[in-house]
Design a protein with these regions (language model features):
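Short, Lys/Arg-rich, polar N-terminal cytosolic tail immediately upstream
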Residues: 1-6
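A structural signal for multi-pass alpha-helical bundles of membrane permease subunits
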Residues: 11-303
């Protein structure tokens, strides 16, 4: 009996060993290496960088550009999930529950799901280049062209420091919302139609249907969406780097932590300082995910 238990344990361990080793080598090991490099002055060329302790972090917290990047990431952390989830829930509810009968959704809802999902099949760099043309400050811009034709002054969507951040946020929402429309639509499709029909018989309007039935039953999905979008807001890089002037400009008005990591590592060759930025970003991301899951925890509703 004891021998059989030992063989079973050995069998299970042999299967678990390979994925655990791969995880340690390719996931945990790079994190440990980044933490070590963050405490050195490595510039990418020396084999043995000098250990400088927490000097990179002291310098980091005194860097005004770093605090601008953190401010923009925190603004995205609040606004991107909030706007995206509100819009995605609205469109998903409209496609699945908001039809003439109040239950079946609007006509052609499958086609609209494909249209909403289309931005997800585009590479992020392609989206950034497309919106560079949309936001052009001259008459060839898709937005400024009609404004100038009507005699209005062109808007510096990417050249005005007061507008550029909101332009970046708009592009991020445009790219993300379609996926969550499809995600929430799948969740709504799993809710029995009988619930909506019974609520309508009891006199519930669409406002009550949404807040008393739809949202409570979709809460787990909304919670996961909020975490994913929050991580996206903290990790955003390509849209800012490709689309904006000076890769985070003008005047650092759109820069984010990921852009500063790339700039310091591959333009200034300050890999130690860039790694310190990465460590701070890592703790921001993990802290947000843990806090979100704990704050939004609630009793599961089954149906």
């Amino acid at each position: 009996m004891l021998f059989n238990r030992y063989r079973r344990g050995l069998f299970i361990t042999s299967f678990l060993a390979a994925p655990v080793i791969l995880y340690l080598v390719y996931v945990i090991s790079p994190y440990v290496q980044a933490f070590y490099i963050a405490m050195t002055d490595w510039r990418g060329v020396t084999a043995t960088p000098a250990f400088i302790g927490l000097d990179n972090f002291v310098r980091l917290f005194g860097d005004s550009i770093f605090w601008k990047a953190v401010t923009h990431n925190l603004a995205l952390l609040v606004l991107l999930p909030l706007i995206t989830i509100v819009l995605a829930l609205f469109f998903a509810f409209l496609l699945n529950v908001g039809g003439p009968q109040g239950v079946g959704g609007i006509r052609g809802s499958r086609f609209y799901r494909v249209v909403f999902f289309f931005p997800q099949v585009l590479a992020v760099a392609v989206v950034a280049v497309l919106f560079q043309q949309v936001f052009r400050p001259d008459g060839s811009g898709m937005l400024n062209g009609p404004l100038m034709a009507l005699g209005a002054r062109p808007v510096g969507f990417l050249s005005d420091p007061g507008v550029a951040f909101w332009s970046v946020l708009g592009v991020l929402v445009w790219q993300a919302v379609g996926f969550y429309v499809v995600l929430f639509s799948a969740g709504l499709a799993s809710i029995p139609r009988d619930m909506f029909e019974a609520a309508q018989i009891d006199g519930a309007g669409r406002f009550s249907l949404f807040f008393r039935i739809t949202l409570p039953l979709l809460w787990d999905t909304v919670q996961v969406a909020w975490v994913y979008l929050g991580i996206l807001a903290l990790d955003v890089f390509a849209i800012v780097w490709v689309m904006t002037d000076q890769h985070g400009g003008p005047d650092w008005s759109t820069t984010v932590m990921a852009a500063e990591i790339y700039r310091n590592a591959f333009q200034y060759f300050r890999f130690g300082y860039a790694s310190a930025l990465g460590v701070v970003m890592f703790f921001f991301t993990v802290g947000f995910a843990v806090l979100s899951l704990r704050v939004s925890r609630r009793e599961r509703i089954e149906y």
